[in-house]
């Protein structure tokens, strides 16, 4: 099986590369290393090729889809706050990048995509636990809007061009190689000052997490 993993040098993507290699896939990682790290893949001595390419550049990235069996699309802007400061960040790195992926798949006859979406597509008012068919999705961040748009692009390429697509709405992933997030910040604050613990709100908030290996 020849697989592409976009964003495969990132936190979640690199763990997915590990899993694909363990089952014998030949993996092509497309990553511009803006947030991903080549060292996350350095332990692979075979079956992994890292291509430093920006998937917002259609002409540069599209030829790599020739002869591929499946695409795992993880690449996106990992910094939600950045999107509020430079407001076209998620449009380019999320929506347009996802268009480039599915259109490259159409051109090169790649049959299957796994799209890494996010629970942020639901917005603030979703019931907990959230049923998969809850809707409409009302994202309240630009990142969430780009993920929602990405889901729609995948769905429309499935309906129009016969692509096979799977969408996963990840939430609060933690584990080795993580570079940011609530738990990451919490642990590093305690490491810097073990005698002081900052408590937000009343301290009774609850949040579910998933370990990246799961």
Predicted region positions:
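NAD(P)-dependent short-chain dehydrogenase/reductase
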Residues: 127-128, 155-214
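N-terminal Rossmann-like NAD(P)+-binding domain of SDR-like oxidoreductases, especially those catalyzing
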Residues: 1-173
